[in-house]
Amino acid sequence: MNRKETLIWSIIDNVIVACDIPRDDGTHSITRESIVSKSREENVVMARALVVEQMVHAGFTITSIAYILNRTVQATRYLFKLSTEFYRTSRAFRLATSEATLMNKDVEPIFV
């Protein structure tokens, strides 16, 4: 795995840690697979929007993020716009954003 892939997965893993809620049976509500899947579950959509926001902050282009998340560019732009709306209306999203930002503070923007 190269440095870029390591950075991508560390951002995704940090967002999962910030957004995940452990279930009673020991499973997790959000996984890597659910982030890149087509799930419309609210928690997964919020986590996906947070991934897009954090990756834009890290310096990735919308096109790269769309490829990573297996989405169209338009859907990725919509997720980025949705993250602003979630931030404005959801306390849980604001808490997850602050936690993920703290975990990703050592991630410096990359310029390719």
Q: How does the language model describe each region?
A:
Residues 78-106:
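Short, solvent-exposed alpha-helical "recognition" segments
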Residues 17-48, 74:
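Short, Lys/Arg-enriched anionic-surface-contact patches
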Residues 1-20, 101-102, 106-112:
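General nucleic-acid-binding
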Residues 63-68:
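Short alpha-helical "recognition helix" segments of helix-turn-helix
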Residues 8, 12, 48-49, 62:
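Short runs of predominantly hydrophobic/aromatic residues within well-ordered alpha helices
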